[in-house]
Amino acid sequence: MSITADAVKIFATGFELFKKFGIKAVTMEQISSACGISKKTLYKFVSNKPDFLFQSFSFFAQRMEGILYEVLEKNGGNAIDDLFAIERFAEKHMRGDEDRLIGQLEQYYPELAPRLKKKREELVFKITQDNLRKGMKEGLYRQDIAVDHITILYYGHILATHENNIAERPANLDELRQTSLRYHIRGIASDKGIQYLNQIINNEEWEN
């Protein structure tokens, strides 16, 4: 999605308003006022509030993808390093507010929720597949893994750690997610990758 600088400002402002006040409470008048434009000008970018919601959430996903890949490039780590960096990034930037807003969408705009969940799924699939191919190239992941299948399974892990209706939900979700991540890595790693993962774990235990 390629958008203009004006659209970036508008969608970013709107998304911050949704995070602060909630989806239902924010009106198009408030968005236009916060952006310093008229409501008529705002409607040059979108057709209605549901359209604005979809565009602003799509913008947020695109922005997070760009920032994440910049972080990974700056870190210069291998595929396993990247997985831990992705987990930290998601915890800091994407969980909490996004999950809460998706819940509000399901309640107030149920027709939008599946489309935006699909956007999130596509983003996770792309990041996961890129990571799998990088790890295979580096020799850290096994060469016989089925990228498409592993992507689906890993996405299932992510959803499982976000569900609110799990009967025996652990008190520490961070530990659950770390366990899930290590489980994922052990399932796809080569001997070289397992050795590297163990180094990370041992270093963490030593630091603690």
Regions found by a protein language model. Give the residues of each.
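C-terminal peripheral helix-coil segments that are non-catalytic and often amphipathic
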Residues: 130-134, 138, 167-208
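Amphipathic alpha-helical interaction segments
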Residues: 81-85, 149-153, 175, 179, ...
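Hydrophobic alpha-helical connector segments
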Residues: 55, 69-96, 154
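Hydrophobic alpha-helical bundle segments that form small-molecule/ligand-binding pockets
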Residues: 123-150, 157, 161-165, 169
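Helix-turn-helix
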Residues: 9, 17-51, 55
